[in-house]
Amino acid sequence: MRVTVFGSAMPKPEETAYQTALTLGQILAKEGHTVITGGYGGTMEAASRGAAEAGGYVIGVTCAEIARWRKLSANAWVKEEWCRQTLHERLSTLIDSCQAALALPGGVGTLLEVCMMWNLLVIKAISPRPLILIGPGWKTTLQSFLEEQGQYVLEEDRQWLSFVDTAEEAAAKLHQKLIL
């Protein structure tokens, strides 16, 4: 199965977020999943690296707009690069190409990825699939959002999100969701 991993480009190898992503990539590859990432550095690189080092297949979805903006190229662990012209096309590819998505801590881009996928699930624009958010920041952030804006989010729409704290818990939750 193809699993997209969303996450930040900022974490360095010595940081916890990078190590969590590395572990996540390893676990996913050992379970036989193809890992799809945004293809660049930080947790995208770490998940790609973990998967590649564990013998898995890694697809990196890069973007010409981002490459022009930051002069970036795909990380060394990407086995197959899918370069899209625009950020919108990249986001659509990351979401449309997977059967599940896992989100590590991140910034505006990661938040956009999570919200876009969540909304597509809500309006049934994509087939049902797990969306698992890793790390306490996601639960805190979205609980705060729901406390302030919850009247605009139906209870049935909240069921698309799953919250876990670790890479291991994410893999277990993914397995559980796939069996149901």
Each predicted region: which residue ranges?
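Short, conserved catalytic or adaptor-binding loops enriched in Gly and charged residues
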Residues: 73-77, 151-156
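Acidic/glycine-enriched connector segments
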Residues: 42-103
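Glycine-rich beta-alpha loop segments
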Residues: 1-59
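Short glycine-rich anion-binding loops that position phosphate/pyrophosphate groups of nucleotides
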Residues: 8-11, 64-66, 106-109
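Short, acidic/small-residue loops that bind anionic groups at enzyme active sites
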Residues: 60-64, 104, 118-144, 155-158
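A charged, well-structured terminal subsegment
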Residues: 93-96, 154-180
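Active-site/ligand-binding-proximal alpha/beta "capping" segment
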Residues: 88-125, 132, 180
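Glycine-rich, charge-decorated loop segments at or immediately adjacent to ligand/cofactor-binding or catalytic sites
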Residues: 42-50, 139-150
